[in-house]
Amino acid sequence: ADTPFIDKGGYALLGNDDFLLDLISRGAHQSEINDYVAFILKATQCIGIKVVNPGGINAFKFNQRALNVDENSVRYKITPRKIVRVLARAVYELGVPHPLHVHCSNLGVPGNFKSTIETIKAAEGLPVHITHIQFHSYGNNGDRNFSSASAEITEYINKIPNLTCDVGQVLFGQTATMSGDSMKQHANHSHAHPDKWLCMDIECEAGCGVVPFKYTDQSFV
């Protein structure tokens, strides 16, 4: 159904699909990667490309439960940094109006603001959009080694002219979290409220996790 006054459009999820990861791992030329990204956009009629936990969803299928920005995946031996770099370049060179839409690694992990900054650096100055950045802006100070690093993130992103971001606003109360980050949704399923959850691969190309959650002002995340 159409919702008046609301612009809508789909993002095609890349960065965990075997075809792209195989191209990157065997050193394919950027033009070949650009052709693949263009094909995906035409076939799906999406308005842009999104990468969720770059390489991490694919690594999860091979029993990796975490993948940092400069850590190689078990299967393809490539890093999230390289995935972000080649996708950001493809989107830019193809002239896609919306920059690469990035859900960073290590969502909700204490100290993850460092990997968020490294993910931004991976784009090497090309335009990117960091989504729900509040979940990627945590430090590890305090009695429980968990703190806000929003000041550090804000100071850094204000220096990057080609970077945009959104907060990912949370409202207190019952909700259902839905994410392509099956690695993180699997890790969080013990917090499900009520105690039901779903996690699956979608045609072995991306991930999906649905975890009901009740946000309160006492929640760390």
Task: Describe each PLM feature range.
Residues G9-N34, R75-K77:
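Active-site mouth loops of central-metabolism enzymes
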Residues E93-H101, P127-V128:
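Short, surface-exposed connector motifs at secondary-structure boundaries
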